[in-house]
Amino acid sequence: MYDEQHAVITPEIRSILPMKVFCIEVGEKYKDELRYKLIWDRLTNYVRQRNEDKSNDKFVSLSMDDPAITPIDKCRFYLGVIIDNKENDSQPGVMEVPGGRYAIFRHIGDYSLLHKFYRTIYEEWFPESKYRPQSTFSFEMYMNRPASTLRTELITDIYIPVIKK
């Protein structure tokens, strides 16, 4: 049972519109702190070059594979920033997050605890809910910044596409 900070696993079920995301593939670079930081630097530079209001930026991660099924070295993992849907589709590095119904879970705490939170979602919440995961990818939206937030106060919204059982 996930009990970090006595979290309650009750998602908001909501339909979202498709979103475009400028992405950079991470692969196994997350294991190397410097290379991982360089990816984040590239994303923030991309935002700066576009002269957008940094306070409204929504940074996300996209997981295309389940590490419980796919070997870690084959998992596709991306970091990105949500961009205006009116942007040109053919821009390199732009992916679309599908619209549809999502279960949105809020995790408050250190990112290192997310794997336990996911395990509880899949092992406890889904079996008891009226929903099952859909076969498209899930994503995380980071609601605050690690550079200016205590680890125990980091907020991550986890979006898992769902369909009724």
Tell where the protein language model's regions lie, with residue ranges.
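A solvent-exposed interaction/effector surface
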Residues: 1-165
